[in-house]
Every structure is written in C-alpha cells, then in structure tokens.
Regions:
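Gram-negative bacterial Sec-dependent N-terminal signal peptides
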Residues: 1-29
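Flexible loop/hinge segments at secondary-structure junctions
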Residues: 30-434
C-alpha cells in the first residue's frame, strides 16, 4: 500500500500516539538503533510497512528478534530506498539522520531520529541497500564522515516479482525470460502479446510501473536483464543501474504509458489498488504478498515458493563470490557492472560485495526463481560511541542462529531469504571500532 494513505482515522491517531510514546521511552534510554534505506527487505526487517517509519518492529521480524535475543531497545527503520539510504549514511548535503521520515510519495532525506528520541545522534547507526556501494558512494561517505569508513555486509536476498493486474485473467501469468526482456525493453507492449485477455479497462496496452527513486530493486532487476537479454538489432541493451531510467535508457524509455513510483510499496499500490486494471511492473515479492497482488511466475518458478534452495530456503553465496574493498565503478560495453578496487580503501575485510554476476544468472544445477537481489546492511567504522555493541549485533543479526530461528518474516514462502555466506560476527565486531 502507499505509505500512510490507508487505514481509518482512529487507527492513525493511535499509531501517532504510539510513536510519541516510543519516542519518549527511547529518549530516556537513548539506545534504539536508527537506520533506514532499502524498501525491498523492509517487511522482513520490521514486519509492518504501513508507514515509511517503523520504530516498533513486530516480534517475529528480523529486528524484533534482534531486540529479543539481545535484550536491547531494538531498531527503527525508515524506508527511503537504497540510493537515499546510502546518501543519508554518508551525510551527503541536504540529508541528515534527524530529518523526518514522512509518509507519501516524496523520498525522505533523513531517518527520523528526532521522532524516535535520538535527538543528539549525528550519524545513522546503520543503513540498508540492495545496490552495493559504488565508487561514488564511497567517495561521498569519505567526504561526509571524515576519518570513518563505511561498512557493508550482505544480509538477505529478495525475489524481485513481476506484479500485475488484469482483472479478466483467470490464471497465473507465467513469463519466459524472453517475455520479461520484452516487457521492460518495450518490445512487448500489449496484454494480447503475452497471450492474456483484454483487461476490464478495455486498454490492451501494458501500463508499466517502475521505481522512480534510486533503488536496489531496480539494480537487481537490471542486473538480471543485462545478463540475460540479448541486445536488439540496433545494439541497444540494458544497463545495470540503481536508477531504472538509466537501465532502460538505450531503448528510449521510460515511455508515455509508463509511470514511476518511489518505494516498492508505492509501486505495488499503483498496480494493485488503482481505479482500473492493466498495470504491470516489478517489486520485491514480499510487498506484493502483503496486499495480495498478482505475482507472475518466471520460467515456471515463483519468487516466493522457489527462492533459495529447497532444503533450508537460503541463497548460497560462496567465498569466491565475495570480494572485499571493491565497489561498482561503472558498466562495460554490454551494460554489465564493473567491480573495481576502492582507491584508498582500508585493508580490513569490512566492505564485502557479492559479485553481481553470482546471482544474475542461475547456475545450471540450480532450479529456482531467477530474478534476485542481494540486500546489504551498512554501518560506520567510527563514531559509534555507546551504540557500538548494539550496532555490531544488529549488523551480524542475519548470521546469528538465535535471531534467524526467531525470525518468521524471512524464509520459506516469504519472498525473502537468508544467505549462506562467509560472514562472521567476529569479523563484524572488528569492523565497528568505536
């Protein structure tokens, strides 16, 4: 749903009172971890995404389980999108951790620290992003945070779903890779070309909804598209980028029948809850599940039922797929991301990047849903102060057996999966210095 526009007035007032109560309580303890960023993992992290800002995650969400296991004051989370989240962590001009996190279509410039009682906090405790640090992101951080350096660890994976609404369709839309390529390159423009009936609206044109903000969901989708969709006759191809308008720019898109929305929840709302049908787009699967949106299968696989391996529902990331102190430095002539060493990076193993090639195309031995994003938790090496222990534990929560066991919002059928990756709590502890 679109942030803050649904629900009755009484519930809205009660929610506001709850936020004020939580803010007063956290002010006394001054230990709630303040962060935000990616919308893709938000349901898994906090359990409820009715509002952009959630300072009371459900007990079975990742952050709720983290609070219970470590008996601390938990974490607040503001859904800004990956690009804005990285900028707020870096202290880019015009952003501030204290700035509000209001509902609506505008992308926030802060994580709402004032709202949750952390009025003296000068930098976020953490951020989340589904697009890994780029060279520009790293440079922005060094400029904004001085002696500190960013930390980055892969946390979870999400299935990127093709969400649609055709009220005359009676069966699940099953797309091939070629059809996914065609929809987002603009070569398939009608429902009839997909073998689907005319929507109730009477308009056969596919009305594509995309992410208008800097988005790790867009990065994940374009990573799949640039790896699996051949160039057209004119040599046009997809570009892996967190800005969807860049990803499809060679095709002269977005087009006049396409519309942009900020955040996964707003994309899903535009597709599912409009006054008419005929819309199609992409969003993290958990967001579509939350509002009972129609989710297409791709090559017969579901982004909820077939995400990760069939046994423990985790996405396997081998040690050879993780590189340290590298960042995305651009794209090659085929639109594939270039991973390069960071100039002036620390020698520690604190900036971990999963090679985009590792999840752009499934290995022949893997039978699962093919469009996947890897989401990261980010932090600061310096300036953590009395929050250091809580921040260490939060960044390591996706690898803590007790936290994982208590988390019910990530796993089988949820559209989100934990990772089997070579990251340890000891490693993270050594990265959060003070």
């Amino acid at each position: 749903m679109i942030f803050g526009t649904n629900g009755n007035n009484r519930m809205t007032k009660l929610a506001g009172a709850l936020v004020l109560t939580l803010a007063a309580a956290s002010s006394a303890h001054a230990a709630i971890q303040v962060g935000g960023g990616a919308t893709l993992p938000a349901l898994g992290y906090v359990g409820n995404v009715t509002h952009r800002l959630n300072s009371a995650p459900t007990s079975t969400s990742l952050f709720g389980a983290y609070k219970t296991v470590f008996a601390n004051n938990g974490a607040s989370y503001c859904q800004t999108g990956s690009g804005a989240g990285k900028n707020i962590l870096a202290g880019v001009s015009g952003t501030n951790v204290q700035n509000g996190c209001p509902d609506g279509s505008a992308t926030p410039t802060g994580f709402g620290a004032t709202t949750v009682g952390r009025t003296t906090l000068t930098q976020p405790n953490f951020a989340a992003s589904d697009s890994p640090l780029s060279s520009t992101d790293y440079s922005n951080y060094v400029t904004g945070r001085g002696a500190s350096r960013p930390l980055q660890f892969p946390a979870v994976a999400g299935g990127i779903a093709v969400v649609y609404r055709n009220d005359n369709s009676t069966t699940t839309l099953n797309l091939t890779t070629a059809q996914v390529c065609g929809i987002f390159s603009g070569t398939i423009t009608t429902w009839s070309a997909l073998g689907q009936p005319l929507p109730i609206s009477g308009n056969d044109t596919l009305q594509v909804v995309f992410r208008s903000d800097g988005s790790g969901t867009s990065f994940g989708l374009s990573n799949f598209l640039s790896a699996n969709c051949p160039a057209d006759g004119a040599g046009h191809h997809f570009i892996t980028d967190q800005a969807f308008s860049n990803a499809v720019s060679q095709y002269g898109l977005p087009g006049s029948t396409w519309s942009g929305q900020s955040g996964n929840a707003n994309v899903v709302n535009a597709i599912v809850n409009g006054t008419t049908d005929g819309f199609i787009g992409y969003a993290e699967a958990a967001n579509a599940l939350a509002v009972a949106g129609n989710i297409a299968t791709v090559n017969g696989k579901s982004p909820t039922a077939d995400l990760g391996d069939a046994t423990n529902h985790k996405l396997a990331i081998s040690s050879s797929d993780v590189v340290y102190n590298n960042a995305i430095s651009g794209v090659d002539s085929n639109g594939r991301p270039i991973v390069s060493p960071i100039s002036g990076a620390p020698t520690t193993s604190c900036i971990a990047l999963v090679k985009p090639d590792a999840y752009a195309t499934l290995a022949p031995s893997v039978s699962g849903y093919p469009i996947v994003a890897v989401s990261y938790l980010l932090g600061n090496s310096q300036g953590n102060g009395t929050d250091a222990t809580d921040t260490r534990n939060l960044l390591g929560a996706p690898y803590n057996a007790s936290v994982v066991a208590a988390t019910k919002t990530i796993g089988a059928g949820k559209g989100l999966a934990f990772l089997s990756a070579p990251i340890t709590q000891t490693q993270i502890n050594g990265c959060v210095i003070n």
